[in-house]
C-alpha cells in the first residue's frame, strides 16, 4: 500500500504526480487526444479536495481513510495519502496502425471512439515510460480520451484503464520500479453503465493506493453475483466493476464527476465486523453487506 501505516499515528504522505497526455492518431486520420481532458482531470476530485465521507480531501485519500476508519479515528485522525498537483508533460503522439486499432462513431453516444489492441498499446506505453526516466517515487498517469483496449479481437472489449509496474536498472546495480497508471477519460453515453469522465482513472487510482505493485495478495475472492474465483489480488475497483451503478456523483462547482465506488479492505480480509467507515465493506456502503465469500 502507499503511505505510512495508520496504526502508527497521524502522518501525511504526498506523492509527486505527472500527467502524460497521449494523442492516438488512427489510420482514418482522426486523432483522439488526451490533452483535451487534462484540465478536467486536474479539476476533478482525484486531485482537488471535496466534502467526502471521511473529510475534506481527495478521492484516493478518502477511500483509503474509509478502509481503515476505525483505526484512523482511534490512532491517526490526521492520517492522509495525497497526490500532488500534477506536473503536465508534453503530449506524446502515437500512430495506431490499421491492424492494431481503429476509430468509429458511437451509435448511441455519437462520440468518437477508438479501439486499440491491448498487447500492442501496452508495449508502446512501457517503451514510453522507460524513455521518460522518471523518479520511481512518483506516479505517472498516461491519459487518453475515448480510447479503449481490446484483447485480440474488438469483440473482447473494453479495457478502460490499468495500473502496473515496470522494473529498470538503478544506480549501483540496484533496481528501480516505476509504478504507473493508464486510463481513458470517457464522454457521457458511451457505456450503458455509469462510466464517464474520471470513472476509469478513479478505479485505477484507488487500486494503486492499495496495491501499487499489483502483488498485494489476499485470499481468493469472487466478484459479487458469482461463485467463481476472480482474483487473489487486492483490487478494490475490480470487486465492484460489474455493478450498473458503480460510480457516484461528486459536484466540483458546476461540474459533475463520476468516481467509482470501491470495496474496502475488510471485505477482502473477511473481517467481521468491518473496520471500515461505519462498519461498511464498500466506500458508499450500499453494495457489499458482508465480507467476501470463499470460492
Regions from the language model: what does each represent?
Residues 1-97:
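N-terminal carbohydrate-binding/catalytic regions of secreted carbohydrate-active enzymes
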Residues 22, 43-46, 55, 65, ...:
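A general marker of short, structured functional hotspots
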Residues 35, 99-112:
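Long, folded non-catalytic interaction modules
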Residues 106-216:
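Active-site-proximal segment of zinc-dependent metalloprotease catalytic domains
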Residues 154-191, 195, 212-295:
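Metalloprotease/metallohydrolase-associated module, dominated by Zn2+-dependent proteases
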